[in-house]
Amino acid sequence: MTSLWLPATGKVYLPPSTPVARVQSTDEYIQRTDIYYHANSDRLLTVGHPYFDVRDTADNSKILVPKVSGNQYRAFRLLLPDPNRFALVDMNIYNPEKERLVWACRGLEIGRGQPLGVGTTGHPLFNKVKDTENANNYIVTSKDDRQDTSFDPKQVQMFIIGCTPCMGEYWDAAKPCDADAGQGKCPPLELINSVIQDGDMIDIGFGNINNKTLSVNRSDVSLDIVNDICKYPDFLKMANDIYGDACFFYARREQCYARHFFVRGGNVGDAIPNTAVGQDNNYILPAASQQAQNTLGSSIYFPTVSGSLVSTDAQLFNRPFWLQRAQGHNNGICWENQLFITVADNTRNTNFTISVSTDGQTPTEYDSTKVREFLRHVEEYEISIILQLCKVPLEPEVLAQINAMNSSILENWQLGFVPTPDNPIHDTYRYLTSQATRCPDKQPAPERKDPYEQYNFWTVDLTEKLSLDLDQYSLGRKFLFQAGLQRASRVSKSSAARASTRGIKRKRR
């Protein structure tokens, strides 16, 4: 039997000419110590109107009551002290000439106060035309069929932990091509990435879209999101981040079901295919001319969802979470001494209804014309974290990766390039404000700007909240127990006690 040799017909893939830089995990170059700190915030409270900002009628720019809704994100920015400036008890922990200290997040607990409750939202002029699930007669629309409608939103519990802000995504109107531009046409859509800030709205069942540009009738969604952007965390982008700073880990729980089924009012933009496009009788058969069905109703169907049951059995909050291995290359290292915690929770969504008398008198009988009704929503948070002290060696490979990731980290460590002085002596004037002395330099030294000053976060200062006494705090005791540190201390204490007891008995003999 003879064999026939044939040349390879497939494509040959060659490796790239330039090597691809490999990003190291923080566990490969950071040395962890056995020193742990506990930090917790104060009781964080906020009160406001659940649907919109209440503004001053005389001055539109002045907000009298801010918008505080259970359907908003709470984006906390925790500021941690610089460990390199700590007065450590043991100064032999690290060598400041060869190492720098950083924090690593090992555990956290997001505490939430207030009882569980379901909050409703809605619109006094909601764009819906009757119920389409159990219709008794064919729907005939008019010029304005909007109704006063309310519903409960989709149930959301979520938090994302990282050392940079959480990234979100939403759909917005894109710029159309010149050939596709025109009045009354549906705009093209594009996916937008942006930072999730404190006060941004979550998806409550109508999708993560920009309602300011995609809802011109101001009636398609509820009042709390009709003039806002609903964002959803971009888990795919954060999971594929090369450094993994935006999301160490996250927890998420969402649930909803379609409760009511409606149809939108207005002209249908994309008509059902018919004879005009060569699709006659493919989708519908026309009705007789004397029937009401001869004039087709709207086919823009949509549901109003419900978050259903709210229970303590499925709560993500008021319980500890421990970080052993993050999803990315950053295993919990808090670069630049800060931590971002983005929270969404509408299981405590009760809106207070407050009634007051318009004339200041105590009413003796009910009269709705003499009563004013107000809405308020309150939220209560408390954040506790466990931090581990870690060392970063000042080696060329490590510094090169940190500089490529974020050069400001090295600037804060005062590792920047120091130029050689060109003149050993400089001029220093006295009486700078005197008319006889030359004017001082008008260009002061540039101050380092906050890279997140353009964003809105709930800043929590923990620079003076750290403690080594972990057993004095609830989260600290839980950490000692799960890490086995408490048991080891007990064994050492009991063994020391037995040794001392034996020594006393020998002396008595």
Curated annotation (Swiss-Prot):
> Record's Gene Ontology CC terms?
host cell nucleus; T=7 icosahedral viral capsid
Q: Which InterPro entries match?
A: Capsid_L1_Papillomavir, Capsid_L1_sf_Papillomavir, dsDNA_vir_gr_I_capsid
Fetch the Pfam families from UniProt: Late_protein_L1
The answer on whether this UniProt entry bears the keyword Disulfide bond reads yes
Which GO molecular function annotation, any one, does this entry have?
structural molecule activity
Q: What is its main location?
A: virion
Annotated GO biological processes are:
endocytosis involved in viral entry into host cell; virion attachment to host cell
Instruction: Tell where it localizes.
Output: Virion; Host nucleus
Q: Mind listing the UniProt keywords for this protein, alphabetically?
A: Capsid protein, Disulfide bond, Host nucleus, Host-virus interaction, Late protein, T=7 icosahedral capsid protein, Viral attachment to host cell, Viral penetration into host cytoplasm, Virion, Virus endocytosis by host, Virus entry into host cell
User: Coiled coil located at which positions?
Assistant: none
The role this protein plays is: Forms an icosahedral capsid with a T=7 symmetry and a 50 nm diameter. The capsid is composed of 72 pentamers linked to each other by disulfide bonds and associated with L2 proteins. Binds to heparan sulfate proteoglycans on cell surface of basal layer keratinocytes to provide initial virion attachment. This binding mediates a conformational change in the virus capsid that facilitates efficient infection. The virion enters the host cell via endocytosis. During virus trafficking, L1 protein dissociates from the viral DNA and the genomic DNA is released to the host nucleus.
How would you summarize the oligomeric state and partners of this protein?
Self-assembles into homopentamers. The capsid has an icosahedral symmetry and consists of 72 capsomers, with each capsomer being a pentamer of L1. Interacts with the minor capsid protein L2; this interaction is necessary for viral genome encapsidation. Interacts with protein E2; this interaction enhances E2-dependent replication and transcription activation.
The record's family statement is:
Belongs to the papillomaviridae L1 protein family.
Q: Which protein, by its recorded name, is this?
A: Major capsid protein L1
